[in-house]
Amino acid sequence: MTLRSDVLAYIPSPPQGVWHIGPIPLRAYALCIILGIVVAIWWGERRWQQRGGREGTVLDVAMFAVPFGLIGGRAYHVATDWRKYFGEGGNPVEALYIWQGGLGIWGAVFLGGIGAWIACRIYRIPLPAFGDAIAPPILLAQAIGRLGNWFNQELYGRETTLPWGLEIYPRFDAAGDPDPMNGISNGVVEKIVHPTFLYELLWNVLVVIALVQLDKRFRIGHGRLFALYVAGYSFGRFFVELMRDDEATLVAGIRINNFTSALVFLAAIAYFVFATKGREAPERLQPGGTTRPWPWQLAALRAAGVAANGPAEPGATASTATDTDGDAKDTPPSDAAATGGQGTAAKGDRGTADAADTAKDASATDSASNSASATDSDFGETAGSSDDADRAAAVKAASGATAAEKSAADKESAAGEAAADTSAADQPAADKSGSAKSAADKSAGKSGAGRGNESESTRDNESTSAGTAASATGSAGAGATDRVDSGENDA
């Protein structure tokens, strides 16, 4: 190995990438990843609320997306550099050592997107709109994460003599053995290389600025801003990969990440061109008005799924309760109450019908008929033409009973007047002759008795007739009301 200490480099590498606090190691790579995640959630939350979303949504989705993204990134790295772990001299267990570096961005975006999709399904929010809100924050998090590559002295490019070249130092452990990840540099420069981590970091920042400005000017939505993020990052990554010379899987002599970048770039451009233009309305970003549970509260998540259309209206419950036949018809509560009151009044009128009070019965029957007519008007064609005929017959019978009562009253009044005239005529005759008076009294008594019997008989007959008419009227009214009640339940 040839050490080069005479080359002036403007960018030195950190002497180490891990520090120990007692037995606990603090790795710069992990700290950069965590810092990037925190910044992405914080900024993404602000952007989501500015677009009309509810506070806390980005953190909720991140509880799914971040673990999925870390697993996907590591899986992509292991799959594309499998010889490092499963080849000759490799240790398969080290494939799980995520803290030692090695995250493939394409695997992180793909599997992290699946986690975000699951969360958006649970919380009932549109995934494309969510992607647009977090696209610039994600890319900024990637830029921060690239600093971890600097601390680990990894993902650098070919050797160069440019003044911004990066110094690479060999690192050794306490025993003096080479340890690039956990060791400490002795200050001797091994080589000067292209700082590809810095190239990608600066490119990411430029794309972030471009995305923010484009979003402000054109109000991009429906996932098209996220597509621009993917396309912009892929374009820059393609050229950065051309400058790297570290170990990687090759396809036809070309690094596999170059193929991936090209394919993803084309797919992102196609989505941007054919996706819906404009931006979603702010109300579409609302999850439905229920308290968001934490992801590990599975029972609460199931309960939250019921609230997609909001809580049930109180009126709907009341209308279902008023349905007496159990078929849960959507009868409005106010109409059901009015119909119930009318039916009760009609039945009360039938129960209180009395032949001795024909006038009140007739009036009550008219009221019941009017109520039945009003009920039919409220519910439309529920009674039918036969009900109209019954109500007309009831009204006619009530009118006949009233006429009969009036005729009976007139006859009784006439009989009373005749009796008064006869008594007035008999008084002078009594003054002239006692015998004549006695005879006249007997005659008047018989005549009065006859008239009394006749009047009583007339009143009995008329009362009987009126009672019969009232009963018929009440029955007709009851039938009409029963049909109205039946129509109410069928409405």
UniProtKB/Swiss-Prot annotation:
The keyword Transferase applies. It is a multi-pass membrane protein. GO terms for molecular function: phosphatidylglycerol-prolipoprotein diacylglyceryl transferase activity. It is found in: Cell membrane. The chain crosses the membrane at residues 24-44, 58-78, 98-118, 192-212, 256-276. Its main location: membrane. A 1,2-diacyl-sn-glycero-3-phospho-(1'-sn-glycerol) binds at residue 146. Its EC number is 2.5.1.145. Residues 309-491 are annotated as: Disordered. Residues 347-360, 453-462, 482-491 have a biased composition (Basic and acidic residues). Keywords: Cell membrane, Membrane, Transferase, Transmembrane, Transmembrane helix. It is an enzyme of class 2 (transferase). Pathway: Protein modification; lipoprotein biosynthesis (diacylglyceryl transfer). Residues 309-323, 361-387, 394-406, 415-438, 463-481 have a biased composition (Low complexity). One of its GO terms (biological process) is lipoprotein biosynthetic process. It holds the Pfam family LGT. One of its GO terms (cellular component) is plasma membrane. NCBIfam families: lgt, PRK13108.1. Catalyzes the transfer of the diacylglyceryl group from phosphatidylglycerol to the sulfhydryl group of the N-terminal cysteine of a prolipoprotein, the first step in the formation of mature lipoproteins. PANTHER family: PHOSPHATIDYLGLYCEROL--PROLIPOPROTEIN DIACYLGLYCERYL TRANSFERASE (PTHR30589:SF0), PROLIPOPROTEIN DIACYLGLYCERYL TRANSFERASE (PTHR30589). This is Phosphatidylglycerol--prolipoprotein diacylglyceryl transferase.
